[in-house]
Amino acid sequence: VSVRIAPLRLEGFEQLPKHARRCVFWEVDPATLGRDDHLSDPEFEKEAWLSMVMLEWGCCGQVATPSAAAGGADESPCLGYVLYAPPRAVPRAHRFPTAPVSADAVLLTSIGVEPAPMADGLPRELIAGAVEELIRRGVRALEAFGRTAAVGDLLDPRNVPPDVAPVLEAVGDCTVEHCIIEADFLTGVGFTVVAPHRYFPRLRLELDKGLGWKAEVEAALERLLESAQLHAPVGASAPAGSVSSRSGAAVDPAAQLRLSAVESC
């Protein structure tokens, strides 16, 4: 079953995974709650935030669904999602020691993938969907606050520096481990660190080159395939099982090369 990446619609809010519907780590500033660190209805707050951003700015997310699912995208099970917004619409953004987000950038806040056989490579495809949509809208860059492996040190309150304490203030069940994207993942999909930090670096992906990282890989694979075809003897057969599926059906060599490249990234 193939996967379809499509813009998030407010009508599809109920299809988002439970954590995505209830997490308001980015959308609610704890300072506005006073002594109460819980919301009576976090799902309502999240849906209201999405509605506001969509109304004032436009699409702020992408969702992955099975392309072969019956019914429309709003009824299909959600396999994964990615959310982003202008930094001015993200109350949590100003709390990071590596803030502010650059004036020309949109802030990537959340990405999640449900356990499924087709989940491999899905986070990268979600990022690609977001990048493609933002390029069409003329956005120059996508930035994100990442978390490093060192955040485990912060479990001991004695290790929490003053500039990090505001980041750790959470609402409800939200935590930095669950609600901040891993910095290693971000660098793996092309982001570069523009504001280093031991715990929460800020990273940036330039969009003015389009899907450069993806296009370069595709172009290299095409050149490799063309070279292999030029040097192959006429009528030569491939080794058994080299470009065939387990069922014995032939597989397009170009597709096989692309799949290998994605799996190795």
Predicted features, each with a name:
Residues 1-57, 82, 143-265:
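Terminal substrate-recognition subdomain of acyl/acetyltransferases
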